């Protein structure tokens, strides 16, 4: 993937930058919907007054889990291990998909999704998704769910085990051969 750069790393921008981030992806806490804000001190109160009632009231166990994650990250390198695993899965899917006759994809650089081109299959995105789920129990998301320019594409997630991804690729190879 690509390493993002924060404006806060520049001395002239540090006091003008608000950083908003979450724990869901970095620490695999999907669904807990907890995040944090790093802001210059003078912006804290207005920001809190504006959003405090909308985003407060998190369960104690979630706060404790986030505290442990932050404190243990330097010791265990959890984020780097997960990043390396996702990178391995991404490379596997991109290589396999691009080896097929009817499917292709670009190398994603900012998420754990593949936007697979299915135009050579002769199916619409909705038709492909229905076929994959009905015949093979393979769940995909039609690209049209992300806008009209998504026609001819389906989204695949690689936020799963390598074993599950290998099975998905096996199914995609079968579909590719059937076309």
Task: List each language-model region with its residue ranges.
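PLP-dependent class I/II
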Residues: 1-179
């Amino acid at each position: 993937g690509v390493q993002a750069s924060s404006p806060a790393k520049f001395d002239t921008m540090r006091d003008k930058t608000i950083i908003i981030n979450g724990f869901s992806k970095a620490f695999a806490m999907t669904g807990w919907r907890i995040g944090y804000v790093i802001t210059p001190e003078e912006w804290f109160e207005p920001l809190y007054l504006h959003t405090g009632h909308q985003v407060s009231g998190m369960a104690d166990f979630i706060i404790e889990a986030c505290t442990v994650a932050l404190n243990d990250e330097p010791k265990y390198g959890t984020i780097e291990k997960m990043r390396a695993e996702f990178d391995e899965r991404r490379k596997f899917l991109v290589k396999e998909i691009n080896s097929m006759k009817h499917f292709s994809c670009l190398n994603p650089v900012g998420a754990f999704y593949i936007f697979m081109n299915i135009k050579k299959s002769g199916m619409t995105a909705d038709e492909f998704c229905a076929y994959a789920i009905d015949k093979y129990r393979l769940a995909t998301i039609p690209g049209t769910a992300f806008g009209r320019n998504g026609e001819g594409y389906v989204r695949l997630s690689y936020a799963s085990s390598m074993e599950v991804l290998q099975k998905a690729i096996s199914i995609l190879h079968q579909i590719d051969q059937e076309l």
